[in-house]
Amino acid sequence: MILAIYLIAAIVVLGVFFLLLSSAATAYLKFRGTRLVTCPETKEPAAVEVDAKYAAFTAPIGEEGLRLKDCSRWPERQDCGQQCLGQIVSAPEDCLVRNILTKWYEGRTCVFCGKALGEIDWLDHKPALMSPKRVTLEWNEIPAEKVPVVLQTHMPVCWDCHIAETFRRCYPELFVDRSSKPRESHQSS
């Protein structure tokens, strides 16, 4: 009888622990990553990062405690009221920079080879951009608050072409452009 009570108590404790852990993990995953918001003070784009650990810590106690961990306007405006958090609460997925970029790449093709970019692999071979000066860039080279301007002026580039163009730019003496030479046939006449 006592063993059954201990077993039931252990199951209840584990269930509550699982619910609290689940709530914390959900909040952490929901609020991690760099986001693009319109600064209420300047009406300009600003890159912000929510303190996802704090959000995860406060989620199990029933309050969604959001605060900024970083902002592109800091340290000058570090004491702002953080009113931009309202934009994140109302549309957490829409302001995530990764999602903005994913939507922009949808249906686009590489400016060099014409290959459809398809689903983006953000961990391995992510696509790049070509600037108006015909220089390819990776996303980590562009400040997040500049994304709206960059998306209007740059063209999509697949990973393979980005690597080839970077090699061509960095090592021009080692690059041989064979596209202008006629192809030789390997078939015997």
Task: Say what each PLM segment does.
Residues 1-10:
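Feature marks short, highly hydrophobic, charge-poor N-terminal signal-anchor/signal peptide-like helices
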Residues 15-44:
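Transmembrane-cytosolic junction motif
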Residues 32-35, 67, 103-109, 151-154:
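Short metal-coordination and nucleic-acid-contact micro-motifs, chiefly zinc-binding Cys/His arrays
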Residues 38-79:
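Acidic, Ser/Thr-rich low-complexity segments on the non-lumenal side of membrane proteins
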Residues 39, 68-71, 110-113, 158-161:
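Short cysteine-rich clusters marking metal-coordination/redox-active sites
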Residues 44-47, 76, 89, 115-118, ...:
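Short functional micro-motifs and their immediate structural scaffolds
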Residues 47-51, 120-124, 166-172:
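Short Cys/His-rich "knuckle" micro-motifs
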Residues 52-63, 86-93, 98-103, 125-139, ...:
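Short cysteine/histidine-rich metal-coordination sites, predominantly Zn2+-binding motifs
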